Structures are given as C-alpha cells and as structure tokens.
Amino acid sequence: MELFEMYESLGVSREVWAYGERVLEGLKERFAAIDQTAEYNQAKVLRAMHENRVDATCFAATTGYGYDDMGREKLEKVYADTFGTEAALVRPQITCGTHALTVALSANLLPGDELLSPVGAPYDTLEEVIGIRPSKCSLMEYGVRYRQVDLLPDGSFDYDAIRAAIGEKTKLITIQRSKGYATRPSFSVEKIGELIAFCKQCKPDVICMVDNCYGEFVEPREPSDVGADMIVGSLIKNPGGGLAPIGGYICGREELVERCAYRLSAPGLGQEVGANLGILPSFYQGFFLAPTVVAGALKGAIFAAGIYERLGFPCIPNATESRHDIIQAVELGSAERMLAFCSGIQAAAPVDSYVTPVPWAMPGYDSEVVMAAGAFVQGSSIELSADGPIRPPYAIYFQGGLTWYHAKLGILMSLQKLVEAGLAEVK
C-alpha cells in the first residue's frame, strides 16, 4: 500500500493530501531548525539527569506522607538544573497549570499586596483565581489588588504605562508567555527578558513570574535564563512529554519555591511531604522525551499555519514567523468551521476517534468551549488537540501531537472535514 493510500484509508482525499504535500515542500528549512533546537534541549535535559545521578531507585513508589522520597527530590533537582533555577517543586499533587499558577500567586502575595499583569488580560481560568470575575477564595477576596496594562495595538509592551503602574505595593508581576485564548503574539524568551529587566529597573525587589505553559523547550533558553524569579507550568503540557498523567511544576528562587511548597501542603511541612504513588517513572521519562515531542508539536503548528494561511484564514503566528510556544491560532470566522475543524482533529485521534466534539460550559471559562482531544491523558494539550471559545473571531487553537506524523494527519483531517462541509476550498 502506498503512503497516500494509507492516508486515504483514514479518510483523507487525494486532493487534500496533495495540497498538504505541496505545503510541506516549503517547510524543510524550518523543520531542520526545529530539530536543531530539540537536539540542544535533549542534551540539556540529559546533562541534568547525569549530574544528579538518576538511577533505577528513583522510580520507587512512596505512599502516605512520602517522607524521604529520593526520587521526588532528585526529579526536582533535574528540573531546577535544566531550567537554571535554585529550586523546583514538581508534584502530582499539582493538578494542572491553573493550579500551579494559583499556588505560586497565593504563596507569594499577601493582603495589601498588588499583582500586576503588563501583558493584558490573563488566561480565562486565571480570571476567577485573581477575582476579575468574582469567585470564592480569589486573590481579591483575600485583599490582593490587581492591576493590568494592556498591550499596544501592535502587540508590543506599553513601557510608559507599565512604569506608571508599578508602585510601592506592586509585589508580583505575572507574565503570560503564551497567547491563551487571545490573538496576540506569544512572547519570545528574549522579549520576556527585556520586559523583566525593565520591571526590575522600575522596582528592583519586585517578583517576576512567568506562566511558561506551552513554551517549554520551544527555544534553547527559558524565561528563567533571562531573569524570571519563577516559571510555572503543567506536566500534561510540554514538560510531561505526553507520558505524565498529571502534575505541575514551579521553578525559581529558593525562598519563593519554599513558600509555594508551604502553600501546596502546609506551613512547616513544605516539600518534605507528598507521596509519588508510583508515578515517577512517567515524570522522568516524559521529561527526557519532552524536547523531541515538543519538536513534533512545533512542526505540526507550522504545517497548520501553512495549510490554512494559503486558504485565506488569518493565522497567528503566520507560516513564516518565529515560534515561541506550540499553539497555532487560526481565525475561522464561524462556529460551523470551528466545529468542523475539531471534528477532523477528533477523527484523527487514537482514542475516542468516533465521537463528535460539541461546545459546552467548561468550568473556569465565560464562553462555551469546543474541544477535540482524543488523548491518552484527559485534557493533555501536548497530545493532538484543538479547542476554542465559541465567540468572535471564532479562532481555533491547535496544539500538540506526540509525533509529527500524527499532527500532520490531524491537520489534514481538519481540512478534509471543512472541505466536505463546503466550508473551505483547496486551492
């Protein structure tokens, strides 16, 4: 059976397949650069594992309190060394990225302190955490103030407004690296470093925290290499490599991470407790594989931009722009196209390929959200997935793919569903 015939057996027409092959012809140099970054990051992870003498005893399960969990402690050293920080908190007890960010914020902000976002509105789920949308136990309910500086129309930082917003009470500055459900650009490590340097110039003791979700291993450097006091993320995204079934991390200055550990467990207990319940092999192996898995996801994102930009759909970033996270936004212009796109991603999934995604009122979001995610780990966005809120400009956010070839199939299937519904025409 020829390669095309295999794709055809999965539902991709000759027309769509041939169109995809034409797009791929122009991406060889981009793909080679991605592979080079993955090779560098693979060596970086491996060096940290060597220096910390990871061995088979690190995979032993612990229960109960989890005292003296050598594997847990060594994993946190591997994360800290890889990301160039003094300390790390890497735990299955952190359930998701929003949870990790909540721990980091609530641990380092006290009543009367001020939180500043110099990059506009945060991700939807953080709105209730902060109290922008009223919620019980939000930071605002506990007396933390929040200020926000929007980006300039061209997506750059409004440095004059940021300088004016940083005051005596400004304790922590939160920088969201990825675009979230917005159509702004994601920020490069270089740009984040420039912003951090500016904020530190305005107030040297301010804490700069970066929401690093979707950004790990996309570039050779991380925000912690350019001055971030804390970086925060989820293990069911990039650093889990598709193997971690749960978990989150906080890496940064030792005193800040220590406070996070006290907030996650209890004052006086901190990092000393937290059984691993036999989950550590997936954490170690996932982190080891993460640079390669992220490379495949990046190739998929660039391919998606190439596919849809040629058909006239606005893509953020576009097919030629540099990449700073694994997310590809495509403005489809209608709810019908969003649903068709997601049905194609779902049809290409290894799990639940026979189901049809429908919008629903997802907890933490203020609009109905449609999600396609036939994943081995529920909600994993390093696995092939697509989602978006059903609201103008009807943008779909595509990410992931444990292998490049799976990402490729998913993108072709998304286009196939649009073509079959008469919502797109291959040119």
Model-inferred region functions:
Residues 3-28, 35, 45-51, 55-58, ...:
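Conserved PLP-enzyme active-site core in the AAT-like
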Residues 309-426:
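Conserved C-terminal alpha-helix-loop-beta "cap" of PLP-dependent enzymes
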Residues 63-71, 75:
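N-terminal small-domain helix-loop-helix segment of the aminotransferase-like
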Residues 75-83:
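Short beta-strand/loop turn elements enriched in aromatics
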Residues 58, 62, 89-92, 326-331:
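Short glycine-rich or small-residue beta-strand-to-loop segments that form or flank ligand, phosphate
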